[in-house]
Regions:
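Extracellular/surface-exposed low-complexity segments
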Residues: 200-223
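Canonical leucine-rich repeat
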Residues: 14, 35, 63, 83-84, ...
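Concave beta-strand-loop units of leucine-rich repeat
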Residues: 1-10, 18-31, 41-59, 69-70, ...
Length: 223
């Protein structure tokens, strides 16, 4: 079944240890500090628009979704949330927006889907050790200096990949450009690495890799 927990100013914690499947919306709960759905394993099919949401809970520090493996989830405007892990998540979409104290994330089994990270200004790194097919949009995170996706082989949903307006170094920009040489499609990719603060143009081999990508019919923007 579906769950809607909204605008409950006296709710401090929410736990459903046996809840396994459905949509949930948890938002605008001014005293909520923890959400625990440890048995929840699947949202609706991944074609559904972001059915699982946890938004605008200003005191929330803990989210437990140990078994969640398939679906679409949005975590937004939870300003005390420092850690968000999905240890079982495999396929779907993860959107993390404006969680200003978020510093740690972990998605060790995420292999196929969409990931967006925006305006999370405390996080310094995000890693996707097993992502093979995906769309990454990682934008406007002022402390972010490292993004890794060693097993990515294919882009999806428009062939766009963006890492702009972060804090990536020239070395990290070089690394991403080199990786994109082998990510399919070979041509038609739109790659954005511009707007780093401070500016971080490609250097050395990175300049060569950028030109190779452009010569192969890709659009590449850097500082």
């Amino acid at each position: 079944g579906d769950i809607n927990i909204e605008s409950n100013s006296s709710l401090n914690s929410f736990s459903l240890p046996n809840y396994k499947k459905g949509e949930f919306t948890i938002g605008n709960n001014s005293s909520l500090t923890s959400v625990a759905l440890p048995s929840y394993y699947s949202g609706l099919p991944t074609s559904t628009t972001y059915a699982q949401t946890i938004t605008n809970n200003p005191l929330l520090t803990t989210i437990v979704l140990t078994s969640f493996n398939l679906g679409n989830i949005t975590i937004k405007n939870n300003n005390l949330l420092a850690t968000f892990n999905l240890p079982s998540f495999n396929n779907g979409s993860i959107l993390l927006f404006s969680n200003t104290n978020l510093v740690n994330t972990s998605f060790p089994n995420f292999t196929d889907g969409v990931f967006e990270l925006r305006d999370c200004n405390s996080i310094q790194q995000v890693n996707f050790p097993n992502l093979t097919t995906g769309r990454l949009q990682i934008l406007y995170n002022s402390s972010l200096n490292s993004v890794t996706f060693p097993n990515l082989t294919n882009l999806k949903f428009g062939d766009n990949i963006g890492f702009y307006n972060n804090n990536l170094s020239s070395s990290m920009v070089n690394s991403i450009l080199n990786k994109m040489l082998t990510v399919l499609p070979a041509s038609g990719k739109n790659i954005r690495l511009d707007g780093q603060k401070p500016v971080a143009p490609p250097t050395g081999q990175g300049i060569i890799d950028k030109q190779t990508l452009i010569s192969n019919g890709n659009n590449v923007q850097t500082d």
